[in-house]
Amino acid sequence: MAENRRNDREQSEFEERVVSINRVTKVVKGGRRLRFAALVVVGDRNGRVGFGTGKAQEVPEAIRKAIEAAKKNLITVPMVGTTLPHEALGVFGGGKILLKPAVEGAGVAAGGAVRAVLELAGVADVTSKSLGSNTPINVVRATVDGLTQLKRAEEVAALRGKSVSDFA
């Protein structure tokens, strides 16, 4: 009983977005084996976001597996108001994503997979540019890489043993 309540709470806590569903085949002696691969991003729109992949013979099962994987792979995004603290360049494989903070009210200027990650992370004002590979998994991983590089001014000041006013 307690297990069911925990699952209900987790489902309501995170919002999911399916970024891509890919039909993949494995050629075997008897022919082709068809399966589906799903890429899902989950987030609470309050600074926590994660992604996961799942593979199964049916699409709903692949999505369920991807959601489970995404919930185990969450990161925390430091934010300044509704935007990012500074620019970041995330790289994964051939995909590069440039993330830039934007003024309040600018909205999310990003496409496809990048938009899904940023919106579910709760970033409301940001500009992004996709450079290189536009494969959804590379783009999502590069975006998450860029978000993990972000640090608030307070964190940088603490690391350097200075006060925040020294950076101004």
From Swiss-Prot:
<dbReference type="InterPro" id="IPR013810">
    <property type="entry name" value="Ribosomal_uS5_N"/>
</dbReference>
<dbReference type="InterPro" id="IPR014721">
    <property type="entry name" value="Ribsml_uS5_D2-typ_fold_subgr"/>
</dbReference>
<comment type="function">
    <text>With S4 and S12 plays an important role in translational accuracy.</text>
</comment>
<comment type="subunit">
    <text>Part of the 30S ribosomal subunit. Contacts proteins S4 and S8.</text>
</comment>
<keyword id="KW-0699">rRNA-binding</keyword>
<feature type="domain" description="S5 DRBM">
    <location>
        <begin position="14"/>
        <end position="77"/>
    </location>
</feature>
<comment type="function">
    <text>Located at the back of the 30S subunit body where it stabilizes the conformation of the head with respect to the body.</text>
</comment>
<keyword id="KW-0687">Ribonucleoprotein</keyword>
<dbReference type="GO" id="GO:0015935">
    <property type="term" value="C:small ribosomal subunit"/>
</dbReference>
<dbReference type="InterPro" id="IPR000851">
    <property type="entry name" value="Ribosomal_uS5"/>
</dbReference>
<dbReference type="GO" id="GO:0003735">
    <property type="term" value="F:structural constituent of ribosome"/>
</dbReference>
<dbReference type="GO" id="GO:0019843">
    <property type="term" value="F:rRNA binding"/>
</dbReference>
<dbReference type="InterPro" id="IPR020568">
    <property type="entry name" value="Ribosomal_Su5_D2-typ_SF"/>
</dbReference>
<keyword id="KW-0694">RNA-binding</keyword>
<dbReference type="InterPro" id="IPR005712">
    <property type="entry name" value="Ribosomal_uS5_bac-type"/>
</dbReference>
<keyword id="KW-0689">Ribosomal protein</keyword>
<dbReference type="InterPro" id="IPR018192">
    <property type="entry name" value="Ribosomal_uS5_N_CS"/>
</dbReference>
<protein>
    <recommendedName>
        <fullName>Small ribosomal subunit protein uS5</fullName>
    </recommendedName>
</protein>
<dbReference type="InterPro" id="IPR005324">
    <property type="entry name" value="Ribosomal_uS5_C"/>
</dbReference>
<dbReference type="GO" id="GO:0006412">
    <property type="term" value="P:translation"/>
</dbReference>
<comment type="similarity">
    <text>Belongs to the universal ribosomal protein uS5 family.</text>
</comment>
<dbReference type="Pfam" id="PF00333">
    <property type="entry name" value="Ribosomal_S5"/>
</dbReference>
<dbReference type="Pfam" id="PF03719">
    <property type="entry name" value="Ribosomal_S5_C"/>
</dbReference>
